[in-house]
């Protein structure tokens, strides 16, 4: 029975809430107690642990965990040798990559990366930043920031390398981006030994499929409608679905039921066009998972 348990590292902190919601949509209910770092998962084959995303790659590589979710940025920062099971395109506030940027005060004379020669740089991403600057032939003093990195310039640092999703915090602190050095998304990772275990590999692949299906569903909705026979061709020309629309003839042979999966953002502009084309009886519904 011991070999039938997958040790999973879940990110604590900024990614935690989004990750737990994603797992729920994928079909896993995870209960987290405020006093415990061991969440209860309604799958006896998964044993979870909450850890800082920065730590997950190290513990996965060493085999203390079979697998885990972390940012691509922390995989590079820790310089670990792990296997990527899946890319999961989500962050704290949305479903797009986050960026690590070099930023300086708005009135700083620093305009380009080359101007950082000999300067002080504060960041949480020390290892990757040093390697990045070295690749550019730039020598600078890079030191670890324990948080509130945006307030360090100009007195405690000449520049910072910081994580941004919307850029709002940088603007609020009157900082100007001079370079993006890394784009990062969440990754589901494992180690070589766990990947060699056929049961664990299949279990991880199944989890990855469900998580990716839940993510894909975030951007899509289902749409049902009734279409008269003489309007069917016109309506179908307007629809862009994941695959071909599902078409069923109704009891009244002059009418059809049409069902499609489409991008949610397209619904508001598409519905009036579909109605004008002759469709009626629209029903829009949310999706939990879309698995191609």
UniProtKB/Swiss-Prot annotation:
Its main location: cytoplasm. Pathway: Amino-acid biosynthesis; L-histidine biosynthesis; L-histidine from 5-phospho-alpha-D-ribose 1-diphosphate: step 1/9. This is ATP phosphoribosyltransferase. HAMAP family: HisG_Long (MF_00079). The gene is hisG. Keywords: Amino-acid biosynthesis, ATP-binding, Cytoplasm, Glycosyltransferase, Histidine biosynthesis, Magnesium, Metal-binding, Nucleotide-binding, Transferase. GO terms for cellular component: cytoplasm. Belongs to the ATP phosphoribosyltransferase family. Long subfamily. Catalyzes the condensation of ATP and 5-phosphoribose 1-diphosphate to form N'-(5'-phosphoribosyl)-ATP (PR-ATP). Has a crucial role in the pathway because the rate of histidine biosynthesis seems to be controlled primarily by regulation of HisG enzymatic activity. It comes from Thermodesulfovibrio yellowstonii (strain ATCC 51303 / DSM 11347 / YP87). The lineage of its organism: Bacteria, Pseudomonadati, Nitrospirota, Thermodesulfovibrionia, Thermodesulfovibrionales. GO terms for biological process: L-histidine biosynthetic process. Its cofactor is Mg(2+). GO terms for molecular function: ATP binding; ATP phosphoribosyltransferase activity; magnesium ion binding. Feedback inhibited by histidine. Its EC number is 2.4.2.17.
């Amino acid at each position: 029975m011991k070999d039938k348990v997958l040790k999973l590292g879940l990110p604590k902190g900024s990614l935690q809430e989004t990750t737990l919601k994603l797992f729920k949509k994928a079909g896993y209910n995870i209960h987290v107690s405020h006093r415990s770092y061991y969440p209860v998962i309604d799958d006896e084959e998964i044993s979870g642990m909450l850890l800082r995303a920065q730590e997950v790659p190290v513990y996965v590589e060493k085999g203390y965990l079979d697998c885990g979710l972390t940012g691509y940025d922390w995989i590079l920062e820790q310089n670990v040798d792990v296997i990527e099971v899946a890319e999961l395109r989500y962050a704290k506030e949305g479903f797009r990559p986050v960026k690590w940027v070099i930023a300086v005060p708005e009135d700083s004379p620093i305009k380009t990366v080359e101007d950082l020669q000999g300067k002080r740089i504060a960041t949480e991403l020390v290892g990757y930043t040093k390697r990045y600057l070295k690749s550019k032939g730039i020598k600078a003093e890079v030191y670890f920031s324990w948080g509130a990195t945006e307030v360090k310039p100009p007195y405690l640092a000449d520049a910072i390398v910081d994580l941004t999703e919307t850029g709002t915090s940088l603007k609020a602190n009157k900082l100007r981006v001079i370079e993006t050095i890394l784009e990062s998304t969440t990754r589901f990772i494992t180690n070589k030994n766990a990947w060699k275990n056929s049961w664990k590999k299949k279990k991880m692949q199944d989890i990855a499929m469900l998580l990716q299906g839940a993510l894909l569903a975030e951007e899509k909705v289902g749409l049902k409608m009734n279409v008269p026979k003489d309007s069917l061709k016109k309506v179908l020309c307007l629809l862009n679905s994941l695959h071909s629309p599902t078409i069923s003839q109704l009891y009244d042979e002059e009418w059809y039921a049409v069902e499609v999966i489409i991008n949610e953002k397209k619904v508001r502009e598409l519905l009036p066009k579909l109605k004008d084309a002759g469709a009626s009886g629209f029903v829009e519904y949310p999706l939990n998972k879309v698995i191609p």
